[in-house]
Amino acid sequence: MISKPDKNKTRQRRHARVRGKISGTSERPRLNIFRSNKNIYAQLIDDVAGVTLASASTLDKDIKDPENKTAASAQVGALIAKRAVADGHKVVVFDRGGYLYHGRVAALAEAARENGLEF
């Protein structure tokens, strides 16, 4: 019998492999993405100190009523970029969390770039 691999386990293995190569610092924090079925979350993380510097998600009150999940992701990208620039973090390391750079992840990344983040 052929067994189909679990997509989330495959993503977690891919994410662990990438996380071994990238790390965030206080000068250049890591922009981490987590995508669930309903929401998307973004965090700026300083891995050296082990602290979250800024965060945004579709659960925030600042997110206006989007027409779809891709538009909501773009709003989250803009919000995390504004919060990061306000805290003085302009250059970040992008961590897509093992997800493909497509759809909601790409929309968040492009909106973050348009609003002042460099990666």
From Swiss-Prot:
GO terms for biological process: translation. Keywords: Ribonucleoprotein, Ribosomal protein, RNA-binding, rRNA-binding. PANTHER family: 39S RIBOSOMAL PROTEIN L18, MITOCHONDRIAL, LARGE RIBOSOMAL SUBUNIT PROTEIN UL18M. Belongs to the universal ribosomal protein uL18 family. GO terms for cellular component: cytosolic large ribosomal subunit. Residues 1-23 are annotated as: Disordered. Disulfide bonds: none annotated. HAMAP family: Ribosomal_uL18_B. It comes from Lacticaseibacillus paracasei (strain ATCC 334 / BCRC 17002 / CCUG 31169 / CIP 107868 / KCTC 3260 / NRRL B-441) (Lactobacillus paracasei). This is Large ribosomal subunit protein uL18. GO terms for molecular function: 5S rRNA binding; structural constituent of ribosome. CDD domains: Ribosomal_L18_L5e. Part of the 50S ribosomal subunit; part of the 5S rRNA/L5/L18/L25 subcomplex. Contacts the 5S and 23S rRNAs. The keyword DNA repair does not apply. This is one of the proteins that bind and probably mediate the attachment of the 5S RNA into the large ribosomal subunit, where it forms part of the central protuberance. InterPro entries: Ribosomal_uL18_bac-type, Ribosomal_uL18_bac/euk. Residues 10-20 have a biased composition (Basic residues).
